[in-house]
C-alpha cells in the first residue's frame, strides 16, 4: 500500500493563537463557552461535535462522535439510545471523557467526569423539539444491534411513522446524559510543537485548580 505523500511527512505549524493563564478564565466552563462561541463564529464545521469515550466492564474502551445539546454549571448534555453500546457501557461504568477538536482554530478541549441520565422532563422537552423524521428515527433504529440491511431501518421508519403519525412519543430507551466535569484540559497549538495546555481540576468546595501542563 502506498500513497503520493508519506503519512509520516504530514505536519503543520500551529501559529494562529496562544493560551495564557492571565488571559484565560478561572472557571473552565467560561473558558469553554468562549471557545465554543469562537468556533461557531469562525464557522468551524459542526463545532458542536464531540468524541465520547466510554469503557466496558472488560476495560475495553470505545469512542464515537455525538453532538452537544446543552451545557451549564451542572455539566455537558447529549442525547442517544440508552440501549446502544455507549448506553450499556455507561450503565456499568459511569466515568467517561469528551473531546472537542476545532481544527481550524488549532484547539482541543478535553473533559472528564461522571455521567448521569438527565430527567425525563428534560429528555421529553428535547425529544419533542426535534424534527419529525428524527423522532421517528429514534423508534426505527435498534442502535448498535446487527441488522440484515438498510431495508430494516426503512421498514421500521414506515411502520412507526404510520403508527404515530405526527405525534411520536419519546421512546423509553431514548434520552439524555449529562457528564459532570471534574477535569478539563484546553490545548492551543503553538509553533515548534511548544503548545499551550491548561488543566483545570475540581478541588471540591474550593473550586477549580488551574495548572499549565507540558505539551
Swiss-Prot record:
Belongs to the pyridoxamine 5'-phosphate oxidase family. Keywords: Flavoprotein, FMN, Oxidoreductase, Pyridoxine biosynthesis. NCBIfam families: pdxH (TIGR00558), PRK05679.1 (NF004231). Catalyzes the oxidation of either pyridoxine 5'-phosphate (PNP) or pyridoxamine 5'-phosphate (PMP) into pyridoxal 5'-phosphate (PLP). The gene is pdxH. The lineage of its organism: Bacteria, Pseudomonadati, Pseudomonadota, Betaproteobacteria, Burkholderiales. It catalyses: pyridoxamine 5'-phosphate + O2 + H2O = pyridoxal 5'-phosphate + H2O2 + NH4(+); pyridoxine 5'-phosphate + O2 = pyridoxal 5'-phosphate + H2O2. It comes from Polaromonas naphthalenivorans (strain CJ2). Gene3D superfamilies: Electron Transport, Fmn-binding Protein, Chain A. This is Pyridoxine/pyridoxamine 5'-phosphate oxidase.
Amino acid at each position: 500500500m502506498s500513497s503520493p505523500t508519506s503519512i509520516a511527512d504530514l505536519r503543520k505549524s500551529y501559529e494562529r493563537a496562544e493560551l495564557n493563564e492571565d488571559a484565560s478564565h478561572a472557571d473552565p466552563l467560561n473558558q469553554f463557552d468562549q471557545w465554543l462561541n469562537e468556533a461557531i463564529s469562525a464557522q468551524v464545521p459542526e463545532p458542536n461535535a464531540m468524541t465520547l469515550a466510554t469503557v466496558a466492564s472488560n476495560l475495553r474502551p470505545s469512542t464515537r462522535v455525538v453532538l452537544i445539546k446543552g451545557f451549564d454549571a451542572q455539566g455537558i448534555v447529549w442525547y442517544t439510545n440508552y440501549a446502544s453500546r455507549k448506553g450499556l457501557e455507561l450503565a456499568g461504568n459511569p466515568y467517561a471523557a469528551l473531546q472537542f477538536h476545532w481544527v481550524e482554530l488549532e484547539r482541543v478541549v478535553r473533559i472528564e467526569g461522571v455521567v448521569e441520565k438527565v430527567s425525563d422532563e428534560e429528555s421529553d422537552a428535547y425529544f419533542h423539539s426535534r424534527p419529525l423524521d428524527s423522532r421517528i428515527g429514534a423508534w426505527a433504529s435498534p442502535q448498535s444491534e446487527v441488522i440484515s440491511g438498510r431495508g430494516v431501518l426503512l421498514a421500521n421508519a414506515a411502520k412507526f411513522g404510520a403508527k404515530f403519525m405526527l405525534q411520536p412519543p419519546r421512546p423509553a430507551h431514548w434520552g439524555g446524559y449529562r457528564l459532570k466535569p471534574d477535569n478539563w484540559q484546553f490545548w492551543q497549538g503553538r509553533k515548534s510543537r511548544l503548545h499551550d495546555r491548561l488543566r483545570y481540576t475540581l478541588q471540591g468546595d474550593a473550586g477549580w485548580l488551574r495548572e499549565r501542563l507540558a505539551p
